[in-house]
């Protein structure tokens, strides 16, 4: 199984207050959040957003089946900065960014055939726009988690450098969990703290 990025983080014990105000800003199906919910023992106050209403509808079904009732879903396009947040600042932001999906290609090798380097650049630009619009909503001592299922440096390490240089967040850990040799998906995670 994959180590969940939320579980490996050493939170500064003094600075943490529960329930942890959390924003999953590219929620899609909410899987990452459900794991975070378990790890943090439900001590979490959650906002979830996605660019598509349909993704949030699926997420509501999944949350309902899992017995998760207390959350605030909303539609937001993070490639722009004109979205409204109920909570101005969060202690934890999870950004499972849209990506090329190159970490899943062991299942669909034909993707490689259609793929162009230009697409990597387009995704990287989109990822930078998304993190640039999410990070300003992180509290001091807050944790920002960046996740992709890509194996490309442009979508991973280069975005990490962008976050460090532009927002001066401190990188706590960064890991590419390689799955392709095990016929599983690869996943990249990076965790930052705003000091």
Show where each model-derived region lies.
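S-adenosylmethionine
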Residues: 1-195
């Amino acid at each position: 199984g994959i180590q969940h990025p939320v579980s490996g983080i050493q939170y500064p014990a003094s600075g943490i207050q529960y329930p942890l105000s959390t924003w999953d800003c590219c929620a899609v199906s909410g899987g990452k959040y459900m794991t975070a919910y378990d790890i943090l023992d439900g001590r979490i106050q959650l906002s979830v957003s996605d660019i598509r209403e349909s993704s949030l509808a699926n997420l509501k079904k999944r949350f309902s089946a899992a017995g998760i009732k207390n959350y605030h879903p909303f539609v937001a396009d993070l490639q722009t900065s004109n979205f409204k947040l109920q909570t101005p600042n969060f202690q934890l932001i999870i950004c499972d960014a849209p990506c090329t999906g190159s970490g899943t290609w062991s299942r669909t090798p034909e993707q490689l055939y259609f793929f162009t380097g230009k697409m990597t650049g387009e995704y990287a630009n989109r990822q930078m726009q998304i993190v640039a619009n999410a990070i300003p909503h992180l509290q001091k001592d807050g944790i920002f988690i960046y996740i992709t299922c890509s194996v490309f440096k442009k979508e991973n390490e280069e975005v990490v450098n962008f976050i460090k240089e532009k927002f001066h967040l401190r990188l706590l850990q960064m890991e590419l969990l390689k799955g392709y040799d095990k016929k599983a998906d690869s996943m990249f995670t990076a965790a930052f703290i705003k000091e």
